[in-house]
Amino acid sequence: MFRLTLGSHAILRCLMALALVTQGRVQSADMPGSVGELWADFDPRRDPLEIEVIREWQEDGGEFRHVRFLVGTFKGKPARMAALYGFPANADRKLPAVMHIHGGGQRASLSEVKLLVARGYAALSVNWGGRGGGSGPVNAVEGAETGDPNTDWGGVDPSQCNVQGYSTLEPGPLQYYEDREHPKNNNWYLLTVGCRRGLTFLEQQPEVDPARLGVHGYSMGGNLTMYVAGTDDRVKAAVPAVGGQGWRWQPHEFTGGVAAPQDRIAGDVDVFRRTLSFESYAPLIRCPVLHRSATNDFHGVMDDVYRTNALIPGQPVRYSWTPHMNHRLAPEVEIAMPLWLDHFLNGGPPLPETPAAALVLQSADGVPRLRVQADATWPVERCEIFSSVDSDPLARFWRSADVVRDGDSFTAALPLDAVDTPLFAFANVYHTLPRPESLAELPGHGEPVR
């Protein structure tokens, strides 16, 4: 079964503060004022990659390599990214290629590479969180041996050993500049540089079709998926998960009070908003996007995921949600990633459209109802409808509704105890897949998704 959810919430009232936060700072003459200005001087193809092959082997019908490539030179020192690369052995055609971006505290994943190789892709999993030395976790790639070269950021450190760097524009000994405030001092800028160089690695491999590149990532990797898709038109399909939503710098007003921003920005908040916040990247995305998440995720907040992706112009956008969870995905949601990539990169069938939904407020019994019309491109197995009166997405309790089915249409009553509360509703439609799909290459997965 494959889960897709509605393209937007049905909302009676959702209270969100939209006030611009400023700090009255004087900007230097070279301070960029937009995403385009921030990235105008970066060419991901300019420098040679200086690829090192640390190890290579054959396994399960694939060719695999532990590699390292040059990200760039910062403060006179080279920065190099370790990664795992693989592709199907004896491929007789140019292959689509996908970059996997790991989450916080994680590492380049051989399992993720194997999953994609088994489906006919070349795949690269970058090890942005690795460190070549010093104190703190090393985070070597999956399967690394003692003494293997690792990611080495040289004169900067955007890894999680420099946590404050994710929410700062200020200078520092580990940042891009040591003498002035600038968006390039932010860790996300440097990590996006590294990931875009990963795309360059992929497009230069002889077995890869450079016109068919995709990217997917989880958590902090979901953030980086949005950054890469918003800055690099080589990306033809993107799948962020539990990350990549905008307005993290902004306080949010709920019925119970005001929640502090997810990120407390050190430096000019308005410059951060215009150059590094995801609502400024979404309008620049020029590829189809599937967003996977959990309804109560702390990192990819549900309401703001919808707000952010609504800014993506003229591209197919889908959502797949695991209800009641925080920062984890059910198998029915996980499988949506390779199916999305298959359609846009590898000739697979199109996924069903987002179900149409209507919130009906006028009824004979005075009870609101949600009506859902599913796309029957794939057989519709069932529909789940949920509602809530909790305005804070992180603490929102989703109540299951009794669903009445009429063909591929579904209706559920959403009774309220009071009329002075917000009402939120969404639906998950489960489709039977064209064929069973395996996730067995990933840890903890056995039975195929059907």
Q: Each PLM stretch: what is its role?
A:
Residues R196-P261:
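Primarily recognizes the serine-hydrolase "nucleophile elbow" in alpha/beta-hydrolase
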Residues Q250-A310:
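The feature captures the conserved acid-bearing segment of alpha/beta-hydrolase catalytic domains
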Residues D375-R450:
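C-terminal beta-sandwich/jelly-roll accessory domains of carbohydrate-active enzymes
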Residues F298, M302-G366, D375-R382, S387:
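Catalytic cores of secreted or luminal carbohydrate-active enzymes
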Residues K114-V193, G246-A259:
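Cap/lid segment of the alpha/beta-hydrolase catalytic domain
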Residues A82, R93-G103, A123:
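Short beta-strand element of the alpha/beta-hydrolase
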Residues I11-Q23:
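Bacterial N-terminal signal peptides
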Residues D43-R93:
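N-terminal cap/lid segment of alpha/beta-hydrolase-fold proteins
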